[in-house]
Amino acid sequence: MTIASTASPVPAAAGLDRQSRNRRALRLWLGLVILALFALVLVGGATRLTNSGLSITQWKPIHGVIPPLNAAEWEEEFKLYQQIPQYELVNKGMTVEAFKTIFWWEWAHRFLARSIGVIFALPLVFFWATGRIEKRLRWPLVGILALGGFQGFIGWWMVSSGLSERTEVSQYRLATHLVTACLIFSACVWVMRGLARHSADPAPTAHSRHWAIALLCLVLFQIYLGALVAGLDAGMSYNTWPLMDGALIPGDLLVQQPVWLNFFENPKTVQFVHRIGAYTVLLVALYHMVSSLRAAPGTTHARRSVVLFAIVCCQAVLGISALLLQVPLDAALAHQGGALILLGFTVAHLRGFYGAYPLPKPVA
């Protein structure tokens, strides 16, 4: 009598369960990193809006973690600040106590940045060493870590632009710094979303995917424009809506020569372009939602497009409110936070077109 032997499903099931647990751990880790990045960008925004970014005039990646601890150290730090143009031309006569306020914003921003490096690097090493990271994700995660390290250099490059001749940082370098932060944020959201389960709904059309890609690019570009607005204090140029001081198109948008310079250095032009960018994002999000509802009604993809359009509308309201209120700190930070939420959801929405990362075959 011959007895047929079959492979037991238990090892395979155990392997899949282990992979699911590993993915859940990675999602929790990346979720923590994303929340920390969100906080970092908001603190960075507050640092810029309170003109605190030049309060620390030296780059000490390790020793700089420790702030001044006594009166003598505060005086020493304050003397360094008194040597730059911002103090001489903007804050002449500032007291040590007033200096402490702007110092703590910049210190908190740098401390958060260093902390995120630790929060990302140490778990990455642990997960890699214990085999919890799938091979396809190892080098992309290392790439994110490397980009984070490079972001530290970009931050100092930005600060250094305001230490010799200018009284504020270069808006070009500020925009580079913010966009790089958004790329790191987006990459973490992309990987985290790929590790989660996806809907079993039919795959969306290529047409919808192309528009989702376009929307993500527009959101990133709009954030870049927002950084130029912040760097030039362009939010104070026109504080009316929908018109700009009574006109749809003001007459002083192209006063600088050469003409292209207006789009980067004329505060009025930069605000105008940022407004046009917002309208463009709104229209593209509306079209994407309508086309998705028509092509795939009732699917998760279509519902996501509705949520995405709603977030765009909320962000537009936040932007208009900040403008009409003449850009108070709380309204400006709410608008910046809204931009990050919009960016994160747009990335997650686009990731939904590609589904979750396939699970590796478990080793029996």
Curated annotation (Swiss-Prot):
Taxonomy of the source species? Bacteria, Pseudomonadati, Pseudomonadota, Alphaproteobacteria, Hyphomicrobiales
GO molecular function, one example? metal ion binding
Identify the cofactor(s): heme b
Q: Does the keyword Membrane apply?
A: yes
Report the membrane topology from the UniProt record: Multi-pass membrane protein
The family classification in the record reads: Belongs to the COX15/CtaA family. Type 2 subfamily.
Q: Where does heme bind?
A: H274, H335
**Function of the molecule:** Catalyzes the conversion of heme O to heme A by two successive hydroxylations of the methyl group at C8. The first hydroxylation forms heme I, the second hydroxylation results in an unstable dihydroxymethyl group, which spontaneously dehydrates, resulting in the formyl group of heme A.
Q: What is this protein called?
A: Heme A synthase
Please write the reaction equations for the catalytic activity of this protein: Fe(II)-heme o + 2 A + H2O = Fe(II)-heme a + 2 AH2
User: Where, per UniProt, does this protein localize?
Assistant: Cell membrane
Q: What class of enzyme is it?
A: oxidoreductase
Membrane-crossing ranges are 25-45, 111-131, 139-159, 174-194, 212-232, 270-290, 305-325, 327-347
Species per Swiss-Prot/TrEMBL record = Allorhizobium ampelinum (strain ATCC BAA-846 / DSM 112012 / S4)
Biological or metabolic pathway of the protein: Porphyrin-containing compound metabolism; heme A biosynthesis; heme A from heme O: step 1/1
